[in-house]
């Protein structure tokens, strides 16, 4: 009975991961496009004082820019959004696969192998270098330096 309940729970967790609710209002909850993609009319087109166009031209330009940007984005996202989502999903799946099945095992293997070498290296340092530097330290510890300031 316990194993059956556990598999039902695991199946529910897997289902929840793939079919979680998405927020249709806040579509950038982590603010990854806060400063990059947010481009308004005022960020692109500006008229300095003394070189103003007619007010009607300015209003129509604003409306044209805003509406064309809005509908062009909608058209491009309709045509290319799903194929690009598929492409990016595939790419990140490949990256995750390589990281899980190649990168991490290689790093772990390297760390295991280097641990053996580090013990030998440490033994060599303690055997050969430590006595030499200890002797040099003893020799140099008796050196006295006297500084005189000549006027």
Swiss-Prot record:
Transmembrane segments: none annotated. This is Caveolin-3. Expressed specifically in skeletal muscle and heart. It is found in: Golgi apparatus membrane; Cell membrane; Membrane, Caveola; Cell membrane, Sarcolemma. It comes from Sus scrofa. GO terms for cellular component: caveola; dystrophin-associated glycoprotein complex; endoplasmic reticulum; Golgi membrane; sarcolemma; T-tubule. InterPro entries: Caveolin, Caveolin_CS. The gene is CAV3. Sumoylation with SUMO3 by PIAS4 may reduce agonist-induced internalization and desensitization of adrenergic receptor ABRD2. Residues 64-114 are annotated as: Required for interaction with DAG1. The keyword Ubl conjugation applies. It is a peripheral membrane protein. Belongs to the caveolin family. GO terms for biological process: actin filament organization; calcium ion transport; cardiac muscle cell development; cardiac muscle hypertrophy; caveola assembly; cell differentiation; cholesterol homeostasis; cytoplasmic microtubule organization. Residues 1-83, 105-151 are cytoplasmic. Keywords: Cell membrane, Golgi apparatus, Isopeptide bond, Membrane, Ubl conjugation. May act as a scaffolding protein within caveolar membranes. Interacts directly with G-protein alpha subunits and can functionally regulate their activity. May also regulate voltage-gated potassium channels. Plays a role in the sarcolemma repair mechanism of both skeletal muscle and cardiomyocytes that permits rapid resealing of membranes disrupted by mechanical stress. Mediates the recruitment of CAVIN2 and CAVIN3 proteins to the caveolae. There is a cross-link at residue 38 (Glycyl lysine isopeptide (Lys-Gly) (interchain with G-Cter in SUMO3)).
